Amino acid sequence: MDFQNDFLTNPLRVTLYNPAENEYTKTFIFLGSVPANVLQACRKDLQRTPKDKEILQNFYGKDWEKKLSQYVVGGDSDDLDEFEKLFVEDSGEETNVMMPEIETMYSEYSIFPEDTFKDIREKIYVATGIPPYRQHIFFFQNNALQVTYRLLLSGSGVALDIRDYKKEFQQVGGLNIDASMESQKDELYVEALDSFQLIKNIHHIFVADLNTLVAPMRRQISIAMEDNYQFDLLYYGLIMKYWPLLSPDAFKLLVQSPLQMEKQYPALSPSLTSLKKRLLLEQKLINFTYARAQQVIAKYEGNRLTRGTLAVTSAMIKISPLVNIQINVRNVFDLFPATPDIPQLVVFFYSKTGPTVVSKHHITSTEPEKFSNKTFRVPTIILIRFINKKAFILTIQNNGHYFIESNWSENERHDFNSVVSTLNNFINPIIHTINDMGPAAFPRGGSLPLPSNEDIQISISSMSVSTFWPYTLSSKGFTELKSRWREYEQAGIISVRGLQQTGIYNFLFKKGIYSYDPHEIERMIIISSGPGRKMDINVALLQNTYAYLFDANVAARWETIYGGRNIRIYHRVTDIKIEMFNITQEEFNYLWVYLFVFLDNLITGPDKILVNKLSQLHDKQQGKGASQLRALQEQDPDLYDLRKYDTQATVYSVLCQHPRPPVIYSEAEVKSMPPAKRKELVKYWNFTEGVPAYYSCPHPDYPHLSLLEGRHPLNYCLPCCQKTKALLGTKRFYINNTCLTKHTFVEQDLEDLNTQTSRHTLSYGKKIPVNRIAFLPHQIADELFLNTIKEPDIFCIVGVEQTMLGISNAGLFYSLARILDLAPKALAIEIAKAANTPQYYILGNGAGNMFSSGAELANLILQTFVEQKNQLLQWDTTWQDIFLDLVAICYDLHCVFFKDKQGDIEFEVSPSTIQKILSPSKKIAIIFDTDEGIYPMAITQQKRFLKNSEAQYIFTEDDPVMEVVQSMSEFMCKDNWWDIHDVKNIPGYTVGKKLINRHNFCYALLIDSDTDRPIYFPIRLSSYIHDDIPIDFDLRPTQIASFEETWKFITLFNKQYKQYEIVPSAVLQNIKKEFVGFLSEGKTGLYFYYAPTQTLPATLEKLPIATLTIDPRDIDQAILYPLEEPYPQQNKANKAFYINHLYKFLLIEFFDVLYGLQSNSTRKHIENLFQKTDFQKITSVTEFYTKLSDFVDLNDIHTIKHILETTDAEHALKVLQKNIFNFDYTLLSPLQSYTYDELCQHLKKLLTPRIEFYEDIETIDRGLINIYTSCQYSTLNQPQCKKKRLRIPVNHFENYIHILAADILNPLKHSTLLLTGLGVIDDLQFILRPQEIISVKNKF
């Protein structure tokens, strides 16, 4: 990394310019801290001796004369406009012009590459005596004149060339003014850029001093200012245009009482004495940094960017395409579904009602309020994706620029490359999905480039980074560190705010920080003046962002936003940690040098701190408990921060209490130790860094290192010192050896160990290690299950895994795998197959409704339990209900639970399981759900289990245990108010089907008899079992038995089941006046339906009539099958709706044809110009832009210029071919030369190949055509398209051609026609999927 001050050998030249006389008056050259002989040789100027010239050449190089001369870059003022002029008109290749001989002054103040133009103003002040508010700075860059602010008039840039001052013919108070500025003063806006531009490679700037105009005319100006109109002409027509640092009041004071400026406006005119003192101190400190930079970089560079010494904890990557892309973010939002993987989306766009924010989220997530409440500047879509519990945020703007951001744990040690790689992997599938949307997302063609594409620029910003200085300080040393930063504060390099915490030094680094958003001050002011807040008029109506120099309210907000980057330095036991917040990668490299030069100076050089203030890393001793634990956590947080992986885990300080924690050393520390001390160390592993670590146990009472197993959530072994050494052949010896070799102790290790060493069964109530067994609680084993088994059999609970990556409560999953004797992944794969079913929604008593399809549910199961790439946290325990149902379906196994929460044991069983238990064929497993975890119950013999883990987990009707479970289930059976199978006891009738709802409950039976149609027999919602009776998930059938047949069955039923007698209470009649059923009274209160009849059955004559305005079956139909064929009336409405929008569809095809015809022609013209241009020669470039301006507008020229500046000419041509320009939209003008009849014939010729003619319109559903695109490129299923052509009835096409011709020839219709490119019929109509929740907000 290069870190040098180029301004030492190529100094900044500041030339004073007098606009009144249009002449340059004096040049100041900022030499900085050069050697004395160089300074002396410079100051001799015209009297330099050959020796002086030799000194200057040796220091500045062969071109020393040019560096110290008075060249001005650029041509005459007529040739260049601020930010606008793109080429010069002179024919020569050299654009440097020698100025007339003027006085040259030399300043010893240093200029640094990290100086902003705000800093430069202050240094000009101390060198020239011209205070900042009187300076109008301009300079030349890329042959264009530039200034340090932007003046906008009605949103458009105003050309700012002070050299045009004398061309203004209107005068007020003896000063030339631009009167047009005053007439539009309310539309003016000044954007201060001084703080957001570095001097960097600019070596010559010019300053126009306002005093050269004001001082000679002060009396005339004062008189003119007495008239408000003339004052406004002066202020807006001259001061705001060229010296915008002055407010109107400050300008008045400058004219009337200039000596009061320093007192009234200290930010505009700071104390010269104080400023000189501060700048000299700054110069001393920064020069020291540059002097030591290369040495420090060489010392630490090898480790600076490695994963061990750098940790990016948050970052934002900005992807900027080189080509113009128009993306319809509204359509992307509409077409992109919310899923458990991408559960939150937000879009901002301009709808027919104005600025609009729409958010949607999956039902497993919450509304993204944080993002929907943001202030947006341009149409934007935000997508939030979760991977392994981590949120990744993608923000896409309508110009194709997009941003990716996320956060990481410091322990993950992400460097810059891994951050980019991680974010790229996250973004690629989403970008592919959006690109597949075709013209619906990209109405003018193109696609979003991937981060790996060559046609983009990538920048990393908004980073939070931790880096580590590999030395440590004593408490006194850290206090000394803090005190040394005070000089930097006095120099203005940093600022310190608020109270400091013990062991942390917090400050803002200000110097050289410029990558801010200049518009953030506007947003903050809008927020601070928003609804419910008292509005400050001066702030709320901010017209000039230089107001921070003359308005205290704006200054406070400015300092909050642009006050520097937050830096925290942590005093740690093992090193010094530095955190940098919200920085760019460029700023990190810059700040790192400053910070490490400062820190290295603490231990090297003449100014190093005392030895007793340094902690000796190579001679660690057993410290106090807190510091020792902190040292371990600092060096290996992945190992010692147990709650990072499990919030319920016991912390290390409890597992290994003082003074038993060991001392950890790195390999570098071990190398510097004496050989005798190295022999005492035990080699282990650093899990955070992925490198060896070494441990010692210095406390005399606990000299032996041991490794604790089964405590860490990831099965890492935890070092802890013990009194005695583990003996050969013991359990502890086996565990220590396994841990030292493998670094972990897992289930298989435990099985091997148990086989060799375990001889006992655990007591109930303890956490059960994997493959260990524990006794049941005595009230279950000795009371409830008394006499159900014989010795030597015992009841036990078997230990299984309780956690996995992505889900913390995985005990049930592992219990089911153990019960079924399956590998966990094999179980997940099988039940995922079963989940991919059309009836997925019934799983978990309707929990499956959270998903849009069985495939989505199956995919999430595989991601979570097989690939372990996802997480089910937002399901809570719902996933368990789904798994239990899937196991029942796949293996015909049902589970009952004993839930022991805080010692209170309860028996729990689901209604569907009760049905199975009470049926003749049954197979169950018993599971214990305790505070320590979820474990399966088994019957085994202790010796047999220790030998081969053999046990019985599944119980059938032949097992005595089943009798106990069955009796308890009968007691809990409340939901089936009669047994479905008892219907078989009614002669002549059988149950033909069970009707099941979306929550997996049976709600009715279809009873078969000797008639053709089944009897509809409703029951109270009930669980059911899978038996020989078919089940049906469809709607209530329409073809059912008559009232007579239904009543005949009910009569027989009432005789057999008097306790459930069915008594009608009201007759049901539909809107057609047909009698369709009755409502029963009593315990049931159910709706009984029969075939519609016009005659009221005699049995029901005396009952009240209840009219059903809507049949409940129709409601169910609308919910379950929303896209079914609509009613005839709806068909007519949709047909009319379709006809009304056919003209819009035709316009889309028309413009698509025109874009291809005209833009291809223009591109060929540009390509020819490219091939004829030598971009190495200014004359050739000038000719290129001149010819280009003949057929493209200024905005397109800017775009082409930007592409040429950011890439080489050869590649630029490829970029241009993909780009979208304004000339792509200028389509209608060539057609206006036609007559009406000629145009009609021309349009027919253009459009007929795009049309599929037919006689009449078929049924069309409105929801499918809300988003429409050209049929030629559509990737959507659009009913108006067939074979990539637009379907239009023959009798309509001719009419549309005549309407289109009339619209083209009518200039008032141009804007209306071009607006059709949006491609949306109703921009506030969105696709609403079953698992999505959408909310809309207007942003006024």
Curated annotation (Swiss-Prot):
It is found in: Virion. Keywords: Transcription, Transcription regulation, Virion. It comes from the Viruses. GO terms for cellular component: virion component. Putative initation factor. Belongs to the asfivirus G1340L family. This is Early transcription factor large subunit homolog.
